[in-house]
Amino acid sequence: MNGHDIADLIKPTAKSAGFDLCGIAPVRNFPELGRFPEWIAEGYAGEMKYLESRGENGKLRRASLHSVFPWARSVVVCAINYNTAHPHSTGFNGPTRGWISRYAWSREDYHDSVLRRLRQVEAKLKEAVCANPLLATSARSGAPLIETRSYVDTGPIVERVYAKYAGVGWLGKNTCLINQKVGSWLFLGVIVTSVELAADLPAPDRCGTCTRCIDACPTKALVAPYELDANKCISYLTIEKRGGVPEELREGMGRQVFGCDICQDVCPWNRKAPASDKPEFQAREGLVNPALAWLAEMSEEEFREKFRGSPIKRTKRSGLRRNALIAIGNSGDRSLMPIAERNSLDPDPVVSDAASWAKQQLLK
């Protein structure tokens, strides 16, 4: 058994574990990783300081996998479709309703559900290598035959870059990974391994001359093809941004209250994206087009109960209420004015500021 045989073994394992796509990339200094330090230096990462983490050699960890794992030789990339049969954000109705990003509708935090499946692939990889110790060419004296690290959006690796070079999809002009058959509604899981496996060919870029994602972005966060300024991105503003949202960006946020799907909703490759039948990715009750009044005045107890095990808990109750109040300001519906007025007196300055802004907007 060789590196090709192992690759041929783990791909069916990924399929049986529930993944839709699986590919293998070598560990290299890809051009996109070379651009990453420049992107950070230009301030495009906003307040996401964790992206600036550096290794002992001073290099950005996410730009150089070898600086974190000197033994790394290959990366197994698995992708799973989370799309569901619900309307897109570009077509949702009702001014008193908000929008939560499709990935956050799920009944279980995707980190947990995807990692659980990824562990099955990792176990099969280890089993195959341990049964064929000659494959462990990089093993050091006294080291295990195979070293692995598995991550779902939590490790020191730019997953989508490795996904491209694993042939799973190409990087679109909206910076999302796009697969020709599945579209871009994909969760990624990666396994970094010390074993050199047969790599797949990179996926060709099929965006062509299309710029629909760039044209559709309300806050102009896509400053150039394949280039995102997170400071302007609605997903960043509603999830990662702490404190108040810059006033000049609030109107562009529309009624997005957690994340944003616009640049994916308008992508032609998602027109025929299949819907997942996996139970854990189906929408929780009330999260598709949620009532803005409910979100703005949700109690701490209700927030914890409703979003236990959900990625929405990342924004915290204060952030979600802030987002809902900005959405109320953008709704144009004066029936929501009492909510803005009540919350303008809230002791949380982030909430009261958003509510006061909403009042002003509704009076226009």
Name each model-derived stretch:
Residues 234-254, 265-298:
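A beta-strand-loop signature enriched in Asp, Gly, Thr, and Trp
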Residues 1-132, 141-206, 254:
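Auxiliary alpha/beta "docking" domains used to position bulky ligands
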Residues 311-315, 344-351:
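Short coil turns that connect the paired helices of HEAT/ARM alpha-solenoid repeats
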Residues 302-306, 333-344, 364:
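Amphipathic alpha-helical scaffolding segments comprising HEAT/armadillo-like alpha-solenoid repeats
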Residues 284-318, 325:
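Alpha-helical adaptor scaffolds
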Residues 321-331, 353-362:
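Structural detector for internal amphipathic alpha-helices that build alpha-solenoid repeat scaffolds
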Residues 19, 212-236, 255-280, 339:
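Iron-sulfur cluster-binding cysteine motifs and their immediate structural context
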